[in-house]
Amino acid sequence: MSKETLILLYGGRSAEREVSVLSAESVMRAVNYSRFIVKTYFITKGGEFIKTQEFTDTPAEEEKLLTNDLAESYPKISPAAIYEKDAVVFPVLHGPMGEDGSIQGFLEILRLAYVGPNILSASSTMDKLLAKHVFEAVGVPQVPYVAAFADENQAEIAQEVVEKLEFPVFVKPANMGSSVGISKVDDLADLQPALSEAYKYDNRVVIEQGVDAREIECAVLGNNSDVSATLPGEVVKDVGFYDYNSKYIDNKIQMDIPAKVSADLAQKIQEYAKKAYKAVNGAGLSRCDFFVTKDGNVYLNEVNAIPGFTQWSMYPLLWENMGLSYSDLIEKLVDLAKETFETRENHLL
């Protein structure tokens, strides 16, 4: 029986390309090579596609995916040249141009099956402002917030923050993930510099009420109504703010899996996670991040449509705790991708 082709797209144009490479390397090592051949394509910061490596067996420990200068010495290809009949694409891409619907639309034009969110779920979860409106509509609780726009009067935005929120607040670009461009602001004097930093990444910004809370995460897997959620895990930090470097570079966090919460609270988190996932028409996978306060209030922080996927990332570890290994999780995601593709193609008839 011939092997199936799994195409890994990694790198990308966003500030989160380093996370993408780490995730893609983990996937290439964990793939079931009795079932798959893995072909890898690097997307440069400029958006160019480069065919890099091909694996028919588990790579050696020291083998790395080609990136940056090394990859760019390879010939560039037309993006459409990644097409291969019956292949499944795993877009291991984070942030803009990766989990915002852009690459998903491109893959649908090519009529390729792909792992993860569709155009709608990717774009709606990537945009923090739009996502907040959707989650409000279905009754999933969130912390108070103020929307800010780069072309508006910044003094008026500051006044709205003073009237509606209490410091500390968190300033977040609306269309970015992995804590890139996010600042914790403890007083009014620091608000404008934080907004200026966020505007580097998006002209639309969310200013959220800070809460003294535990950070609890829940992994979701499935398509349509057939959706499963894990027992939650907890992010335990050695730093005051769980920023990009503490997440991926400095290793200043640890995770408790499963989280030490009551059965009732775990069930509430699972139900909110599934409700949020279905509200944005989730497909394949998502990681839903929550705040849980000392008095038991639960607030949805965000839904990550393509969560970090290294072998030490929360998403696969949550499923491992439920008895689904990293390698089996990848196979399940491929099967879900093929199911979604078949449904989409049938709807076009």
From Swiss-Prot:
It catalyses: 2 D-alanine + ATP = D-alanyl-D-alanine + ADP + phosphate + H(+). One of its GO terms (cellular component) is cytosol. The gene is ddl. Residues 132-335 form the ATP-grasp domain. GO terms for biological process: cell wall organization; peptidoglycan biosynthetic process; regulation of cell shape. Its cofactor is Mg(2+); Mn(2+). Pfam families: Dala_Dala_lig_C (PF07478), Dala_Dala_lig_N (PF01820). Its EC number is 6.3.2.4. Mg(2+) 1 binds at D289, E302. Cell wall formation. Mg(2+) 2 binds at E302, N304. One of its GO terms (molecular function) is D-alanine-D-alanine ligase activity. This is D-alanine--D-alanine ligase. Pathway: Cell wall biogenesis; peptidoglycan biosynthesis. ATP binds at residues 162-217. Binds 2 magnesium or manganese ions per subunit. Belongs to the D-alanine--D-alanine ligase family. Keywords: ATP-binding, Cell shape, Cell wall biogenesis/degradation, Cytoplasm, Ligase, Magnesium, Manganese, Metal-binding, Nucleotide-binding, Peptidoglycan synthesis. It is found in: Cytoplasm.
